Regions:
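Sec-dependent N-terminal signal peptides
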Residues: 4-13
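Structural signature of transmembrane alpha-helix termini at the membrane-water interface
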Residues: 12-15, 51
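Boundary at the C-terminal end of the N-terminal hydrophobic targeting segment
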Residues: 17-21
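Alpha-helical cap/lid subdomain in secreted, periplasmic
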Residues: 24, 45-63, 70-237
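Catalytic nucleophile-elbow at a beta strand-turn-alpha helix junction centered on a G-D-S/GDSL motif
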Residues: 29-42, 68-73
Length: 237
């Protein structure tokens, strides 16, 4: 019971770098880009559910374009698959959720200058487009989650990995602020969640299980909405 209370309290008491809630608009088409964290979110659907519960009258649509291994400048696809821009146009994206930074973090501290430059270019270029044919998109940039130590002798404990992810999360926050882009720090909050949860949030330290997916969705919900607005229950939806 104490651990459950600690998790609930922690979800309420996170820090938020954004001054205002994210400005969703009725009929928004949300396209989700990024690495395995983004791709695996389609398995349980908690993030979309949490957002719909806040905005049941907005008629939002979500399209998951996440792809394992994706980086800002490296997105391997079969020939004829179409470019990232093609798919953002096909989905009429006017809101983009971008999950990057984990794969890039393996370049270490020496890779930070290139990463910051690539991220700045990605944000500026993306913000300049009109994928829905009318408006420049609004972006939410998400940091990687922390690496969880699930105490399996066959898996790394995540200490070195988290040092790198921490550096890249801070770099992402800086670049997002410079471009006036909404930023969600998943690293710091998940690192704290791991310490108070009695159950693992991941299957292997880095990929969320359903319990972890739900808690991360709650983090995202609270950062996007900053506890403003009514939340509808499952029966209403």
């Amino acid at each position: 019971m104490l651990r459950f209370f600690s998790i609930a309290l922690l979800l309420l008491c996170f820090s938020n770098a954004n001054a205002q809630p994210f400005p969703f608009q009725k009929g928004d088409h949300v396209s989700i880009l990024g690495n395995t964290l983004a791709e695996r979110m389609q398995h349980h659907g908690w993030m979309e559910t949490m957002i719909h519960s806040r905005l049941p009258g907005h008629e939002l649509s979500f399209r998951n374009l996440g792809f394992s291994g994706d980086e800002l400048t490296l997105r391997l696809r079969s020939s004829g698959f179409g470019s990232p821009e093609d798919w953002l146009k096909q989905t009429n994206a006017n809101v983009i959720f971008a999950f990057f930074g984990y794969n890039e973090s393996f370049a270490g501290e020496e890779g930070l200058p290139k990463f910051e430059k690539d991220l700045d270019s990605f944000l500026k270029e993306t913000l300049s487009k009109k994928y829905d044919g009318k408006n420049n998109p609004r972006i939410v940039l998400f940091s990687p989650i922390a690496h969880e130590n699930i105490k399996d002798p066959n898996l790394p404990n995540g200490i070195e990995n988290n040092k790198r992810i921490d550096l890249y999360t801070k770099a992402m926050a800086k670049v997002a602020a410079a471009n006036k882009v909404f930023f969600v720090d998943l690293f710091t909050t998940t690192l704290n969640l791991y310490s108070v949860s009695e159950k693992p949030l991941t299957i292997n330290g880095i990929h969320l299980n359903e319990f972890g997916d739900k808690l991360v969705a709650q983090i995202i919900e609270k950062q996007l909405f900053q506890n403003e607005g009514d939340k509808k229950d499952a029966a209403f939806l």
